């Protein structure tokens, strides 16, 4: 597939930070796409102008309706098309005539729907190119901008202002996965700056939005779910820019199997390339690859809470000999540096832990901290003082609220008192354990 002309940053601003929005296919029916978009806009307290278009209604709620796109004022920033696929091309032509800057198209059935759909998608792209219109989609869920309070999506979206801290940007060809990832990050108390679903990428693609987020001061980490890069060379160039700017990209890249590549073609019309080759190339540019959606969330959280990449090795603290062995296998597989520890080269650790516990890395504390809770503090203090370690991972077993009460308070107290100058990652074992939420909040 030939590489499209990049969308300019100014054009994307009209889409992602609009001053005026038109909803084509506005509806009073709860659950209808147009109704959901309006609800999200009002919930996010969008401060710009909202124009509703519905030929069969004079008013929806307290807002007047226009009979057609032709009645829109000139130069509306973005129009959301909550209409059937058969009406999309004529509507895009009419929007171009009204000098609308951008369009969000939910409708499916274009490139992923066979030759006829592909032909219509090419026509859509040609109209947009001739008019300078930015198009998000088709076959997408739209986007959410929590920085400025704009939610142009039909998925119910709570208004969660970003606050003063930089957030996580999400760019995904899959709208459903973008929504799931956003909920996952919210449950981890991580703010999302932008969440953008690109769908079929008829006009703009993941590369355009990645470039926008790299230049966005409110975005620190960028999570991506991409089945196929339509502009791979450009993506690698932008990834290099992200690395220079200190912004971590974390990528979930489905498509390793032939079946997954066929699925991508029916999902977003993507033509998946050489997955193994792309994996090597993106890693060279500092992109971190995730193997699952859950791992994507974990890596994003680590990158967001530890913005400076640690220098030096990793100390793993475990409470299980079996988990120690699993950790050693995984570290060897992933090439994680593990400085060797023993009684002779680690006197601080030897003094901190019981005599029957071997000094090693990973360091297996056994269950001793249940009767000696200060063991956590002594171990963490030794790791902080040891310059061989740039990062500490606490693999703590969590099984029930009673055990959690014995373990979490001394760990939280130790971290608050010691104020580590290096990242400490709490990797609790057994995510199904009923750990009181105040302990999780205390660790964060």
Task: Go through each PLM region and give its residues.
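Catalytic-core regions of core metabolic enzymes
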Residues: 1-444
């Amino acid at each position: 597939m030939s590489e499209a002309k990049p969308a300019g940053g100014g054009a994307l601003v009209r889409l992602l930070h609009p001053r005026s929005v038109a909803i084509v296919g506005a509806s009073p029916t709860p659950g209808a796409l147009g109704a959901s978009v309006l609800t999200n806009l009002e919930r996010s307290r969008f401060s710009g102008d909202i124009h509703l278009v519905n030929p069969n209604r004079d008013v929806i709620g307290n807002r007047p309706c226009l009979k057609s796109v032709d009645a829109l004022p000139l130069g509306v920033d973005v129009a959301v098309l909550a209409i059937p696929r058969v009406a999309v091309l004529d509507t895009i032509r009419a929007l171009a005539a009204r000098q609308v800057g951008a369009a969000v198209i939910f409708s499916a059935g274009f490139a992923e729907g066979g030759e006829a759909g592909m032909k219509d998608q090419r026509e859509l792209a040609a109209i947009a190119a001739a008019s300078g219109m930015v198009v998000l989609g088709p076959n997408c869920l739209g986007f959410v901008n929590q920085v400025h309070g704009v939610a142009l999506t039909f998925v119910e979206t709570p208004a969660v202002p970003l606050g003063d801290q930089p957030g996580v940007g999400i760019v995904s060809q899959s709208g459903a996965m973008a929504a799931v990832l956003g909920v996952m990050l919210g449950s981890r108390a991580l703010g999302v700056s932008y969440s953008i679903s690109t769908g079929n990428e008829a006009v703009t693609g993941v590369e355009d939005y990645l470039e926008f987020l790299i230049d966005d001061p409110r975005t620190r980490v960028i999570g991506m779910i991409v089945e196929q890069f339509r502009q791979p060379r450009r993506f690698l160039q932008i990834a290099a820019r992200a690395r220079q700017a200190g912004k971590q990209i974390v990528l979930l890249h489905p498509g390793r199997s032939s079946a997954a590549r066929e699925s991508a073609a029916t999902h977003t019309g993507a033509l998946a390339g050489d997955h193994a080759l792309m994996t090597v190339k993106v890693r060279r540019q500092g992109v971190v690859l995730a193997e699952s959606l859950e791992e994507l969330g974990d890596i994003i959280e680590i990158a967001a809470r530890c913005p400076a990449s640690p220098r030096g090795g990793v100390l793993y603290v475990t409470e299980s000999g079996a988990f120690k062995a699993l950790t050693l296998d995984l570290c060897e597989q992933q090439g994680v540096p593990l400085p060797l520890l023993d009684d002779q080269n680690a006197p601080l650790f030897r003094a901190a832990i019981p005599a029957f516990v071997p000094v090693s890395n990973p360091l297996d504390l056994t269950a001793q901290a249940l009767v000696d809770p200060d063991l956590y503090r002594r171990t963490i203090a030794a790791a902080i003082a040891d310059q061989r370690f740039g990062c500490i991972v606490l693999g703590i077993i969590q099984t029930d609220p009673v055990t959690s009460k014995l373990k979490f308070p001394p760990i939280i107290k130790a971290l608050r008192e010691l104020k580590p100058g290096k990242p400490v990652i709490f990797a609790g074992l057994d995510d199904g354990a009923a750990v009181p939420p105040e302990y999780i909040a205390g660790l964060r």
